[in-house]
UniProtKB/Swiss-Prot annotation:
Species assigned in the record: Mus musculus
UniProt keyword list: Metal-binding, Nucleus, Repeat, Zinc, Zinc-finger
Stretches the record annotates as Disordered: 1-20
Protein name: Putative transcription factor ovo-like protein 3
Keyword Repeat appears in the UniProt entry: yes
Family: Belongs to the krueppel C2H2-type zinc-finger protein family.
């Protein structure tokens, strides 16, 4: 089987989603609740609140603790807006990011990128103690705790070290200078 590598490249033009209905097009679909009754106490409070649709079809304030954002479609709550936005994609039937090897669809580009590692064999998270490599950071952290008895104490930059992959032969390097030097070998041959 030929080796295949995930390479970032620009599309000739952005995809056109105009043929899809609105609820399938947006990053996060929140249904139009303008026809539902908003409780009078919340109309003029000036507070931004999170709403959920009750079984009777009326808006109710979603359960949340201090500093959390509730999903308007299910009981889950999140501490950050970006986490809520990502979660809202799971309620949409549209899966824009499709694996061209197996056809599996994903709501998020990051999930597709992580999935592609199963096809490419790229394992960017390496254990410093034994050298074993993993496709996901959480797998490395679990390995460190279970096998080496180390709690995960990596700095963000160490965890997210970029792996440079040659699309021609599969050469990998974490150092951009080594990757650039390798690429010159392909240009000379």
């Amino acid at each position: 089987m030929p080796r295949v590598f995930l390479v970032r490249s620009r599309r000739p033009q952005p995809p056109n989603w105009s043929h899809l209905p609105d609820q399938l097009r947006g990053d996060a679909y929140v249904p139009d609740c303008s026809s539902l009754a908003v409780p009078p106490a919340h109309r003029s409070s000036g507070l931004r609140d999170t709403w959920a649709v009750s079984s009777q079809g009326t808006l109710t304030s979603a359960p949340k603790g201090p500093g959390t954002l509730g999903c308007p479609l299910c009981p889950k709550a999140f501490p950050l807006q970006r986490m809520l936005t990502r979660h809202l994609k799971c309620h949409s039937p549209a899966r824009r990011h499709v694996c061209h090897y197996c056809g599996k669809g994903f709501h998020d580009a990051f999930d597709l990128k992580r999935h592609m590692r199963t096809h490419t064999g790229i394992r960017p998270f390496r254990c410093g103690a034994c050298g074993k490599a993993f496709t996901q950071r959480c797998s490395l952290e679990a390995h460190l705790a279970k096998v080496h008895g180390q709690p995960a104490s990596y700095a963000y930059r160490e965890r997210r070290e970029k792996l440079h992959v040659c699309e021609d032969c599969g050469f990998t390097s974490s150092r951009p200078d080594a990757y650039a030097q390798h690429r010159t070998l392909h240009r000379t041959t």
